[in-house]
């Protein structure tokens, strides 16, 4: 299983990956993790990824283009890695991998929010059936 996290604070996850159950799962190659900063996909020199709400109002919103591009990037990277794991002969025998490798990949993109569903053991079991999870973490005050 591959879990990719899109976050404005990628350094927050360093300690999380290097301890306890997550660390052991990574070492046993049962899990791979990655963190992508949407600032890397910003369209200006300041790395800006937030903007004022359309129509005015208080607060700030995350801009869509850097988030979309970050998600597209981690999906493309995973598809490339999994596709490169097959030789040409194996790909010819496995018709579902020809053309669009993502057809055979079970993936879920989840935008984390303050009003979302609680994370339960049942939800963990459901998500564990996917090949790739992409978690988009917002920044809330």
Regions found by a protein language model. Give the residues of each.
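N-terminal nucleotide/polyanion-binding subdomain common to many enzyme families
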Residues: 1-75
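Short, acidic/turn-prone active-site loops that include or flank metal/cofactor-
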Residues: 10, 139-141
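S-adenosyl-L-methionine/SAH cofactor-binding core of RNA-modifying enzymes
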Residues: 63-87, 91-93, 97-135, 139
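Short, flexible coil/turn micro-motifs enriched in small/turn-prone residues
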Residues: 50-54, 133, 140
């Amino acid at each position: 299983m591959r879990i990719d996290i899109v976050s404005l604070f990628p350094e927050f996850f360093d300690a999380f990956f290097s301890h306890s159950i997550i660390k052991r799962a990574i070492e046993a190659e049962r899990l791979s993790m990655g963190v992508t900063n949407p600032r890397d996909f910003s369209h200006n020199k300041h790395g800006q990824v937030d903007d004022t709400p359309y129509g005015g109002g208080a607060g700030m919103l995350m801009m869509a283009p850097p988030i979309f591009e970050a998600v597209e990037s981690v999906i493309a990277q995973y598809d490339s890695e999994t596709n490169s794991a097959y030789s040409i002969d194996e790909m010819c025998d496995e018709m579902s991998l020809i053309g669009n490798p993502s057809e055979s990949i079970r993936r879920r993109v989840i935008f984390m929010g303050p009003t979302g569903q609680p994370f339960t053991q049942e939800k963990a079991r459901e998500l564990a059936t996917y090949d790739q999870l992409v978690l988009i973490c917002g920044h809330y005050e």
